[in-house]
């Protein structure tokens, strides 16, 4: 058991002269006493002061808890708003019962007890910084602080948190550059910094980390995406609602065996779609809507056997919608609206009837809800040319459903699509909402 003293040191009490006289000459028996007392005629001796008490003694279950106690109490004093009153529970030595704090045995000593996890999600706490708090919790493994009002920048000292594997700063008021300290955290697998005011670029080193989840959406990131984006081990990648520019890196195909969901939506991405997107055979969600992408849809997208949500709406794509894409058996939503496509074949038209495919506001003149002839003519008067056009006809997989013999027959829907069983919500799309995941 460890002990930690809390309190102030004892100080001598200053006694007034009248009190001195009352005690030294209690009966006024000496002449000097009489003369002194005459100066204090009518003055009563004050009551005896209460006895000094020793400081409170706090006893902790482990020395590691004693060490973080002053860290927590110092941080508590910086909090200017606590609408749920959670800090009222941050009293005494039982840190493991503080609201938002959770204890466990650290990896280096299974007999010890330490603060291993913090969950401030939804507390609405306001504080000027987390510096001096988070970076001093050396045994922390999980830190979640969604929907608070923490500000400032992220301290580079968090790189010393050797056990930290989940870090969530989402929906706060952090600013400055991307918190580069995280690139030195070898055990980090979950990084969520969405809904803040971070600016600048994403460091290339982030895409060499062993992350499972990376959410940076709804910030002010800009510049080009790193060329090594495809080197990532991330399964869920959300880059949406920023100001990223330039093309989608061709290296994305290197993430074929890991990437499950990726959101590029609502940025300023431009250029042509790389056919390497079709190599993402594990992908169930791919959304690059609301950008400035152009060119045809690569036929390689027909290799996305597991894809359920495929969204390229709100770009400048053109040409024919490949039938091989419409033939994908797990498609639940194929959004191609607000582009400049000119043709859809029988399989795609079948998806339109099923309300799986949306091609409104294109240049397919025999369908309703299309752009005007003049608007389409204006676009094609200044064609956007993609290099290596032959790559757009490549289907880099052996597909069980392609090619179909003439006449076209719509392929059977997969059992998962037929059963209509409720599915867990998409983690990436859920990240577009401010609440906790």
Language-model segments: what does each one mean?
Residues 129-135, 154-156, 175-180, 199-204, ...:
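The feature encodes a structural signal of leucine-rich repeats
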Residues 22-100, 379-397, 401:
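Surface-exposed cap/linker segments adjacent to membranes
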Residues 123, 148, 169-172, 193-196, ...:
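Consensus "Asn ladder" position of solenoid repeat domains
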Residues 132-230:
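A generic tandem-repeat structural signature
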Residues 304, 308-318, 322-393:
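Leucine-rich repeat domain C-terminal region
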Residues 79-132, 369-372, 387, 414, ...:
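LRR flanking "cap" motifs
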Residues 222-321:
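Eukaryotic tandem repeat interaction scaffolds
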Residues 112, 135-140, 159-164, 183-188, ...:
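Leucine-rich repeat
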């Amino acid at each position: 058991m460890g002990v930690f003293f809390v309190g102030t040191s004892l100080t001598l009490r200053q006694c007034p002269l009248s009190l001195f006289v009352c005690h030294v000459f209690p009966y006024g028996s000496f002449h000097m006493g009489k003369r002194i007392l005459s100066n204090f005629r009518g003055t009563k001796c004050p009551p005896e002061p209460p006895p000094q008490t020793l400081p409170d003694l706090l006893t902790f279950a482990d020395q590691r808890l004693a060490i973080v106690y002053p860290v927590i109490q110092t941080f508590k004093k910086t909090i200017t708003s606590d609408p749920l009153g959670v800090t009222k529970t941050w009293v005494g030595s039982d840190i493991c019962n503080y609201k938002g704090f959770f204890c466990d045995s650290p990896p280096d000593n299974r007999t010890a007890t330490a603060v291993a996890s913090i969950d401030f999600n939804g507390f609405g706490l306001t504080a000027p910084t987390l510096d001096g708090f988070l970076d001093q919790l050396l045994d922390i493994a999980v830190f979640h602080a969604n929907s608070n009002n923490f500000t400032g920048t992220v301290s580079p000292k968090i790189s010393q948190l050797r056990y930290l594997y989940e870090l969530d700063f989402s929906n706060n008021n952090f600013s400055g550059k991307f918190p580069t300290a995280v690139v030195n955290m070898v055990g980090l697998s979950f990084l969520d910094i969405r809904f803040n005011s971070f600016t600048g670029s994403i460091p290339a080193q982030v895409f060499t980390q062993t992350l499972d989840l990376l959410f940076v959406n709804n910030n002010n990131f800009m510049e080009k995406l790193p060329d090594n984006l495809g080197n990532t081990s991330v399964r869920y990648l959300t880059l949406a609602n920023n100001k990223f520019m330039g093309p989608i890196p061709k290296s994305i195909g290197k993430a074929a065996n890991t990437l499950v969901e990726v959101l590029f939506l609502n940025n300023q991405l431009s250029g042509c779609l790389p056919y390497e997107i079709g190599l993402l055979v594990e992908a169930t969600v791919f959304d690059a809507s609301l950008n400035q992408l152009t060119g045809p849809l690569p036929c390689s997208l027909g290799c996305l056997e597991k894809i359920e949500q495929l969204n390229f709406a709100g770009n400048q794509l053109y040409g024919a919608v490949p039938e091989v894409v419409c033939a994908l058996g797990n498609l639940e939503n194929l959004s191609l609206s607000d582009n400049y496509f000119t043709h859809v074949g029988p399989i795609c038209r079948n998806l339109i009837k099923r309300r799986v495919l949306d091609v409104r506001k294109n240049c397919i003149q025999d369908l309703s809800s299309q752009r005007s002839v003049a608007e389409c003519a204006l676009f094609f008067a200044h064609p956007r040319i993609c290099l290596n056009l032959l790559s757009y006809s490549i289907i880099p997989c052996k597909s069980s459903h392609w090619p179909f013999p003439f006449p076209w027959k719509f392929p059977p829907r997969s059992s998962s699509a037929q059963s209509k069983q409720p599915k867990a919500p998409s983690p990436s799309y859920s990240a577009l909402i401010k609440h906790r995941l």
